Amino acid sequence: MKRLCLWFTVFSLFLVLLPGKALGAVDFPNTSTNGLLGFAGNAKNEKGISKTGTTGGKNGQIVYIQSVNDLKTHLGGSTPKILVLQNDLSASAKTTVTIGSNKTLVGSYAKKTLKNIYLTTSSAFGNVIFQNLTFEHSPQINGNNDIQLYLDSGMNYWIDHVTFSGHSYNASGSDLDKLVYIGKSADYITISNSKFANHKYGLILGYPDDSQHQYDGYPHMTIANNYFENLYVRGPGLMRYGYFHVKNNYSNNFNQAITIATKAKIYSEYNYFGKGSEKGGILDDKGTGYFKDIGSYPSLNKQTSPLTSWNPGSNYSYRVQTPEYTKEFVTKYAGSQSTTLVFGY
């Protein structure tokens, strides 16, 4: 009898200590910071001063999120946590959840959707990873400030293998909502291996006012290995003030892709622009930023802003692929996934 009790105790300890799973848990891409690149990684500023890379909730408690209330409870604060969606989360109306710091929010392979859930920063929090998520929202939530991922403070954010699925739209309609806003003092961000689709407006990057020059230099941002499909404008984005490294992305079915606005420093490399490029809308250049492109397809013209002297190679090391490879890769691997994540570089 004693031997049986001892065996049961040892077996119970084995269950408690077994890594990566818990009772009732779900499979998820527990990849830590594998695949992290660009400004959210180990990068330097313009003075050559290095910063640490984004770690999110690394080494923190794994918490399985089953409800919107769970998400509100655990996404705030500064305690490191890895938050795994065990259920798809949905709200009937716009529901805002505040982002804290030192968090990884990751969708499981089976359940990964946030519908009408709007994530926003507060104060100077940061060091957050968003991975393997699908953002959806109702078409009637379409005001100017209706943006599902809103980052305006803190540093070190990594948005990876995330899908913003959008919805049908009328290009001449009154929709003003966007998919993503990153600006004000938010800094050192990478968007990678993600998909943005089916929306009138895509991404707005940098403080959205041409007279607020105190935000010059924000954000430092890498946009790499992403797929922009059927965004009428702003995919990859409308860019102001910051440093934007835009490499190996595929934009298709667009009216305007890159909008160059006030004091944006944009270094574009080896992107592929598909249907829509024949209309001449790859560059929407206001003439007030700085821009350079190398190797994109087709060749970019209609540039009126001066060439940027900035090169992201002074901030971090990186590699590039051809535009043709990029198109094939992101079509297959960008966005949230139901199996293993594949990372571009």
UniProtKB/Swiss-Prot annotation:
Gene3D superfamilies: Single-stranded right-handed beta-helix, Pectin lyase-like (2.160.20.10)
Catalysis: reaction(s): Eliminative cleavage of (1->4)-alpha-D-galacturonan methyl ester to give oligosaccharides with 4-deoxy-6-O-methyl-alpha-D-galact-4-enuronosyl groups at their non-reducing ends
Active site, UniProt feature: 234
SUPFAM superfamilies: Pectin lyase-like
Keyword field contains Protein transport: no
Example of a GO cellular component annotation carried by this entry: extracellular region
Assigned keywords, A-Z: Lyase, Secreted, Signal
Top EC class for this record: lyase
Any Pfam family matching the protein: Pectate_lyase_4
Signal peptide: 1-24
Recorded coiled-coil stretches: none
InterPro entries the record matches: Pec_lyase, Pectin_lyas_fold, Pectin_lyase_fold/virulence, PEL
Localization in the cell: Secreted
Entry GO MF terms: pectate lyase activity; pectin lyase activity
E.C. numbers: 4.2.2.10
Family to which this protein belongs: Belongs to the polysaccharide lyase 1 family.
Function: Catalyzes the depolymerization of pectins of methyl esterification degree from 13 to 75%, with an endo mode of action. Cannot degrade polygalacturonate.
Protein name, per record: Pectin lyase
Annotated organism of origin: Bacillus subtilis (strain 168)
Upper classification of the organism: Bacteria, Bacillati, Bacillota, Bacilli, Bacillales
